[in-house]
UniProtKB/Swiss-Prot annotation:
SUPFAM superfamilies: (Trans)glycosidases (SSF51445), EGF/Laminin (SSF57196). Disulfide bonds join 362-373, 367-389, 391-400. Residues 358-401 form the EGF-like domain. It comes from the Eukaryota. Optimum pH is 6.0. It comes from Caenorhabditis elegans. InterPro entries: Aldolase_TIM, EGF-like_dom, Glycoside_hydrolase_SF, Hyaluronidase. One of its GO terms (molecular function) is hyalurononglucosaminidase activity. The keyword tRNA processing does not apply. Endo-beta-galactosaminidase that specifically hydrolyzes chondroitin, releasing GlcUA-beta-(1->3)-GalNAc-beta-(1->4)-GlcUA-beta-(1->3)-GalNAc as the main product. Also hydrolyzes to a lesser extent chondroitin sulfates (CS-A, CS-C) and hyaluronic acid. May regulate the function of chondroitin in cell division. Its EC number is 3.2.1.-. This is Chondroitin hydrolase. Residues 1-22 form the signal peptide.
């Protein structure tokens, strides 16, 4: 009897493990797979009448009336008008704001003002869109403070030398770095915590993070450098507090003629962002920022080519970011309405519709109509076999071909009537004296291909 019990249990375990191998089943506690949203973060509310821009007909999400305040899709907080964030304007040491250095800022005063700003910008306490904090005047790591940002190193060392005039240069530099990073962490973390407390359903994070080296692809590399991966790993304290990641794959005029190179850069950053999510904040959403104008400030009529849409927006969609955010400035928006409208209707909108049709086709052919296709890795002109599937409940498998449930799995193809194999724990109960009792029926199963059927009973 013990031998029979052992073989029955072993068979159930083998069936369960074999069925689950390679599964992409989401599970009852996780959300269903969704296709990437596209969000219109362009302040085009002034575009009226014949120049109004209707992005919703292309499936693009927007705030009500395309406003930046009080909407349901997004809110963005810029350092110059949010709280009392300390910084040197344009990295100029002679123009400090709110103390200039983070270690000279007033965190309490900042949080008081930031609370007012959040309540004003997001009046809905149940807001569940993206909440982006945009701090670009300084970087929260000493090692990242190069070029114009080195002013924060210079001024931090100057401050520490004033505080400790008899210390050695090495001691001063060590303490300056420590004080700077500690102050940065306080401002970044406490601001996030405030936002999460006031609007707990929002997706909070900092624009431009994670980061990647901009020269990916110049040699034969396709990933962010080891150095930048280390920088991102050292920001673990930031990922632990974030609920969203907001990398930027913006293109600029100097990049417009290099769509292949741009593709590698975009793919490397999205891949790195997924690594950070996987290792440090599995519950974080990924919202990728992109543009449609190379330089909306000086050449607003110079829009992305279709090749560069493929290298940015299209790639982020196929790699299944939670959303792709199309951003632009409000500068001279009134005079840009006509060209924006033309580009949306003639290029951007039709391109998104084509991408959607291709993903619909992939869904049916690759995922048997039961999941969403996505690219695990960047791939130019991907074939259908380059895509993987995120399966809808209760399906799983490489092509969502199997049907399962939380307490177990079923091995027959989903198109067949499933015979569910219960979870192994269902075969046991605990008696009053604490011993485990085996409750499995006296029967054996046999497997032919993907089918399992009752072979015989004892």
């Amino acid at each position: 009897m013990v031998i029979v019990w052992y073989h029955q249990l072993l068979l159930v375990l083998l069936i369960f493990i074999g069925a689950a191998k390679g599964a992409q089943y989401i599970g009852s506690g996780a959300s269903q797979p969704n296709r990437t949203d596209v969000v219109w973060m362009v302040p085009s509310w002034t575009c009226k009448n014949e120049y109004s821009i209707d992005v919703e007909k292309y499936g693009i999400l927007q705030n009500e009336d395309q406003h930046f305040v009080g909407g349901k899709q997004f809110a963005i907080f810029y350092e110059h008008s949010f709280g009392k964030i300390p910084y040197f304007k344009a990295q100029n040491e002679s123009d400090p704001k709110n103390g200039g250095l983070p270690q000279m800022g007033d965190l309490e005063a900042h949080l008081i003002q930031a609370e007012k700003d959040i309540n004003e910008t997001i009046p809905d306490e149940n807001f569940n869109g993206i909440a982006v904090i945009d701090i670009e005047e300084f970087r929260p790591m000493w090692e990242l403070s190069w070029g114009p940002f080195s002013v924060y190193k210079t001024e931090s060392i100057r401050l520490t030398r004033q505080q400790h005039p008899y210390w050695s240069t090495k001691q001063i530099e060590w303490q300056a770095e420590r004080d700077y990073e500690k102050a940065c962490q306080k401002f970044f973390i406490e601001t996030l915590r405030l936002g999460k407390r006031l609007r707990p359903n929002a997706k909070w994070g900092y624009y431009l993070f994670p980061k990647c080296n901009g020269d990916v692809g110049q040699k034969s590399d396709t990933d962010c450098s080891t150095l930048f991966q280390k920088f991102n790993d050292n920001l673990h304290w930031l990922w632990g507090e974030s609920t969203a990641l907001f990398p930027s794959i913006y293109l600029y005029p100097s990049q417009k003629q290099n769509p292949e190179y741009n593709f590698v850069n975009s793919g490397a950053l999205i891949t790195e962002t997924k690594r950070i999510k996987r290792n440090y904040c599995p519950s974080c959403e990924i919202h990728v920022f992109t543009k449609i104008e190379y330089n909306p400030y000086y050449t607003p009529d110079d829009f992305y080519s279709k090749q560069n849409l493929a290298s940015t927006l299209d790639l982020a969609i196929k790699m299944n970011a939670n959303s792709v955010v199309i951003w632009s400035t409000s500068q001279s928006i009134g005079s840009r309405c006509g060209s924006l409208q033309t580009y949306v209707d003639n290029t951007l909108g039709p391109y998104l519709q084509l991408t959607d049709r291709n993903l619909d086709k992939c869904r049916m052919e690759r995922c048997e109509g039961r999941g969403e296709c996505y690219l695990p890795r960047p791939k130019t002109n991907p074939a259908i076999y380059n895509f993987a599937c995120r399966c809808e409940r209760p399906y799983f498998g490489k092509s969502c071909e199997y049907r399962g449930r939380r307490m177990g799995v079923s091995m027959p193809k989903a198109s067949q009537t499933p015979q569910v194999i219960p979870d192994v724990t269902a075969y046991f109960s605990t008696s009053s004296n604490g011993t485990k009792k085996y409750n499995a029926p006296n029967q054996f199963y046999s497997r032919t291909g993907g089918d399992i059927k009752l072979a015989r009973k004892l």
